[in-house]
Amino acid sequence: MKTWQKIVVGGAGLMLASSILVACGSKDSKSSSSDPKTIKLWVPTGAKKSYQSIVHKFEKDSNYKVKMIESEDPKAQEKIKKDPSTAADVFSLPHDQLGQLVDSGVIQEIPQKYSKEINKNETQQAATGAMYKGKTYAFPFGIESQVLYYNKSKLSADDVTSYETITSKATFGAKFKQVNAYATAPLFYSVGDTLFGKNGEDAKGTNWGNDAGVSVLKWIASQKGNAGFVNLDDNNVMSKFGDGSVASFESGPWDYEAAQKAVGKNNLGVAVYPTININGQEVQQKAFLGVKLYAVNQAPSKGNTKRIAASYKLASYLTSAESQENQFKTKGRNIIPSNKTVQNSDTVKNHELAQAVIQMGSSSDYTVVMPKLNQMSTFWTESAAILSDTYNGKIKESDYLAKLKQFDKDLAAAK
């Protein structure tokens, strides 16, 4: 990693700079290389065209130019940390990278003006996704959660409210032989267990090693003998859904169009997760909630408060109600908005997928904001191994508790 000088500008200075940003814009148009008038922006892959109008509006209002580049969100942290001083001023990222970027000093708490707007305009879960250790570090512009897809010719809307009804009347498919922890691990939330504590930020706060956790493993193991359960793999989800072998499965918005093609637009139903019976208790199945963010990297500005203030202003434009509505309507984007006003618009209310995701993301009854800690890398591999081995019969039932207690210890010791 190249050495760079860390310059952090406080909120008061930024607000002063922001207030004179437009007025001073024309005077600074002949600025030197130490006071550049161009902001580098990284947007998600395939999103550049959809942001052109809002970026043009920002340029007109601020007298700053924006150099917009498409970049892969999952690699945001890696690319920014490589050399923050030459990276983007404003960049998109998934919220689970937030903690590592804050801990490494790459991004700072956003000015209070914007954090107040976020808390007022965005859903509570989305605002939580933009926070770390009680402070707001980024701007939400969308939410993402898995939902239940089902074939309406095989199951009714009432049927899919209960996992037991689904599997008694038809079939449910999931990847249990090779578990996807993102999809399956939230079952532990359903029985009251926590991952990295109640707020997801306590590295030693995982408590799967208890009777509730054991009941989850017993349930997973029991699905091998459930006639209504079909094990899937990465390559056959849509083919099984299309040929009728599977009447329902859980996935995210990214599979919506493929699911429509598999069973036909008129046959595809979308719903929130069902309730599920674990150890004789009817509980709500839960999912991870992902939040899409824009963050500001102050390093390229080299202490130029006007440019930093302009960068925060650009992030605010990109995540505004107007921009979120456009991101939802644009074909190929279809980002589910986190802004409460946009969520209540007729366009969003009349969209079945959007309504299911919004209900999933409406409260902790359905979703838990995915933790942002470094230790998540250990979590993914170790939890997937335990869950897969349980389904495949590689762990004795008598060893479930010990395995889970060791898992808790391993996560607590991870860095």
Label each residue range with its predicted role:
Residues 70-79, 96, 230-243, 254:
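Short helix-initiation/N-cap motifs at beta->coil->alpha
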Residues 202-233:
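Glycine-centered hinge/linker elements that transmit conformational signals in sensory
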Residues 137-141, 146, 164-214, 246:
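Extracytoplasmic/periplasmic solute-binding protein
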Residues 103-109, 133-135, 259-283, 351-352:
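Ligand-binding "clamshell"
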Residues 262-333:
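Extracytoplasmic/periplasmic substrate-recognition and gating elements
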